[in-house]
């Protein structure tokens, strides 16, 4: 497929707000695409690079290059060239990348150049494109949309399912099953303002401790154990304690969902930064394990003895979990019969906070496991308002922060796929955080205008705030009150950041 075709469709999709039109455009594109093009086409349309960060800044992309008069670049050719750019390292790498990018831009038409610049700077972003692409694939291939969605959920990759569908037709979907050793995207929770609100919405439910650790998915098949993060990265070698714990469990073949935590000598949780550092340590795992020992806490079972449990109600999944996992390795919880039993939920929340944990997750007892989705049957409650936002820009600091990128411009996901700025903050940052974020944001920089450095919207940061107030200064019409940085969430992607819609729904007093 020619890049020009993709660039034109991307422009048309961005220009229409009608979901049906977006689906039709993508369906037509997929019908014309070769199966081997799709693993490139889908991330390009969503504004993602399969290669990840390439170290290409605005200075390289801003150099004027005479465009080609006729389109000749294919998407696979572009992908290969960008892979080559990313492979340039060492002395003179900047010049080498600049030369390769110049050659690529010279082979691109003006429309293709604009698309490539947007792709490389993070400006090509389509709202909820993966969900629309599922519908487009279904329409293009004649497969039921629900079957395509389930296959994507089980494969953990839209590109993998799309390639199989286009190569083999709807029958290929039968090959996507929940399989030990192949991770699936985890179910996520929406936010509720209080325990009473959550119990009122869900009725009979389980109120579980919300642990401030790293989400893990544990797979065991006999003596073989694999451990995956929420982004499906394999971290088995970094967590020998979890492998040992898995081999002690009663079952022989299962998939469990849980959290990795670390406790201090008093049994209270250690900081998220310590746990993240431990899980991220690849060099001396033994030393890291001695310094920050971790343990698993499980809260769901997805598969047991080859039996897919995803569609079963939570009560049945938890019964299977309890059969396999001893109580000390299961998350603490309280069963609540409904709103009339709200006092029990409030008591459990207070006890959870007293134990040093960050809140609770309230789960409907009759709900299935919605892998890869933020299900309405899971509601998290934290006493402090927090949001996962995306850093859009940062400002060079003054005084003791001279030379450091300090004041963060914060954005939430808007309905059209862009990021709506909600305000700025320089509060809550330690010296170590300032040093780290300056280095990280410099890598993401795409433009510098005076003291403001615009960055690719890739870095997620957890922000605490005291509330919302109306503001005509920002596109969503609101801004955060007393926003401060809690921590960076490199374990989350921008697609997992909070939305403007969710934020406004959580503060009806401001939007009335």
Curated annotation (Swiss-Prot):
Its EC number is 6.5.1.1. This is Probable DNA ligase. ATP binds at residues 208, 215, 230, 259, 299, 374, 380. Its cofactor is Mg(2+). CDD domains: Adenylation_DNA_ligase_Arch_LigB, OBF_DNA_ligase_Arch_LigB. It comes from the Bacteria. PROSITE patterns: DNA_LIGASE_A1 (PS00697), DNA_LIGASE_A3 (PS50160). It comes from Streptomyces avermitilis (strain ATCC 31267 / DSM 46492 / JCM 5070 / NBRC 14893 / NCIMB 12804 / NRRL 8165 / MA-4680). GO terms for molecular function: ATP binding; DNA binding; DNA ligase (ATP) activity; metal ion binding. It is an enzyme of class 6 (ligase). HAMAP family: DNA_ligase (MF_00407). Keywords: ATP-binding, Cell cycle, Cell division, DNA damage, DNA recombination, DNA repair, DNA replication, Ligase, Magnesium, Metal-binding, Nucleotide-binding. DNA ligase that seals nicks in double-stranded DNA during DNA replication, DNA recombination and DNA repair. The active site is at 210 (n6-amp-lysine intermediate).
